């Protein structure tokens, strides 16, 4: 039997559970881990948490992405082509993910009346975009922030491909290092360059190691300089999906499915 953790269960930083159910869940996690022939999870940091807790070897099987989801996507959506578009897709987890450094950099350029800054548009699509709206108002940049709310996946995939930059918000938490969401892999196979903001965790390092974008942490000055370069470039070049599929083949779901089978066959 394989016990697979796509996210941590009772150690999940986004949801700690409710008493008394969390006590029952702790017991269930211990029980199933004890019975499992193989325990798997999505990253080395999460594996270390589980190994320390359950005293068993934990194998790594990534979430991955199926490139055919893009190849077969017939949905065609466009962002405003008159703008330089930075796009974030997905949920923003309050207290863990924060676009404030980007807004602060944008505010500074607006106050400097930097040439072309009015051409920049930052779009958020997904659940809880109200958090982005509130922060945009706080920094006075709401006129250049667009929140679309929840959209179907086919639409999101299309928008990711036509954006000029994809914004990835890494977790500002010591416990966020091993969180590798499916959204990360969607971004990686989009063909669009990625900017990561937040504490530099494993997700940001994967983007940097594969030369898929830039990692800025929470450094407002670096983000400000990157925005200046973007205003000159306007529309950076794209990566070919065919080349990405070859370069990132070990991040595909097919590769990871085989990895799961290998873990099972070893026991």
Show the residue positions of the predicted features:
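Membrane-proximal helix-turn-helix segments that form the acceptor-binding/catalytic region
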Residues: 19-39
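Carbohydrate-associated surface elements
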Residues: 45, 64
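Acidic anion/phosphate-binding donor-loop and adjacent secondary structure
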Residues: 65-83
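Conserved donor-binding/catalytic core segment of Leloir-type glycosyltransferases
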Residues: 78-96, 103-106, 256
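Nucleotide-sugar-dependent
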Residues: 97-100, 152-158, 166-188, 194-205
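Nucleotide-activated donor-binding/catalytic signature segment of Leloir-type glycosyltransferases, i.e.
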Residues: 117-126, 131-155
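A charged, aromatic-enriched C-terminal amphipathic alpha-helix characteristic of glycosyltransferases
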Residues: 218-222, 232-266
């Amino acid at each position: 039997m394989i016990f697979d953790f796509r996210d941590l269960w009772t150690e999940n930083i986004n949801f700690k559970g409710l008493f008394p159910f969390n006590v029952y869940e702790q017991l269930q996690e211990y029980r199933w881990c004890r019975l499992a022939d193989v325990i798997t999870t999505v990253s080395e940091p999460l594996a270390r948490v589980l190994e320390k807790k359950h005293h068993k070897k934990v194998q790594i099987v990534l979430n991955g992405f199926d490139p055919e989801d893009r190849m077969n996507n017939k949905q065609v959506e466009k962002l405003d082509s008159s703008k330089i578009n930075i796009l974030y897709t997905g949920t923003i987890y309050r207290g863990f993910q924060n676009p404030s450094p980007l807004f602060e950099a944008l505010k500074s350029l607006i106050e400097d009346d930097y040439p072309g800054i009015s051409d920049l548009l930052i779009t958020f699509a997904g659940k809880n975009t109200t958090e982005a709206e509130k922060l945009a108002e706080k920094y006075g940049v709401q006129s250049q922030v667009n929140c679309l709310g929840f959209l179907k996946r086919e639409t999101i995939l299309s928008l990711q491909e036509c954006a000029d930059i994809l914004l990835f918000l890494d977790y500002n938490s010591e416990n966020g290092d091993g969180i590798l969401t499916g959204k990360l892999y969607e971004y990686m196979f989009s063909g669009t360059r990625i900017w990561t903001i937040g504490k530099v965790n494993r997700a940001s390092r994967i983007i940097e190691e594969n030369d898929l974008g830039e990692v800025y942490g929470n450094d407002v000055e670096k983000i400000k300089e990157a925005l200046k370069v973007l205003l000159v470039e306007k529309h950076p070049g794209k990566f070919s999906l065919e080349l990405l599929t070859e370069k990132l083949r070990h991040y595909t779901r097919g590769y990871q499915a085989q990895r799961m089978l290998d873990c099972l066959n070893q026991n």
